[in-house]
Amino acid sequence: VTNEEWSEAELKKMFPYFCTLHSLAYKRLRLEAHEIMDELDYMELCDMTGRKFVNKMKKGNGIDISMPTAQSHYQDVINLAYAKYPNDDDRLQKVFREVKLPDYGARNTIMQMDKDLTNFKRDRHKLEYVDYFNSFLEMKNPPPLKYLFIDEAQDLSAHQWMVVDMIQYISKPI
């Protein structure tokens, strides 16, 4: 064991919750990899709907990292709607007023894609990154924390701030 490996292992032992908000939600919800949408799920959804869906998450070592899609403008609009207006059933309509859509049929296509994705996840009991936060907020089970450190807070979405607020309210860190 090298000093670097030992240090990382010791850090994980000493600070088990030193992680991203997504990883914290993943851990606290006790999620398993098979419950998360993966490449095969997105490929199946594409085949079923004839529309382009891409995996926005990169999995590794139990940590999920959000990646930009860039391959699916319509899916990016859906993701933006959930990030900006997580608890608003009118989220897509609000985002439609804020972003320039590429063509006249885009609204209908995006609304159908959102419905298809929602139904697919429901039918297969799968989650995406945005679902971690929704479930974590519903469950309200943050770990007991002495300190709460938010790195790059300026980049957090409204949804992520809701998670931070819930953690602060329940855990009451210094």
Feature-to-residue mapping (PLM):
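Short, flexible loop motifs at catalytic/binding sites
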Residues: 155
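Glycine-rich, phosphate-binding/catalytic loops in enzymes
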Residues: 34-35, 165-169
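Accessory N-terminal region flanking or inserted into the helicase ATPase core
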Residues: 59-149, 158-163, 173
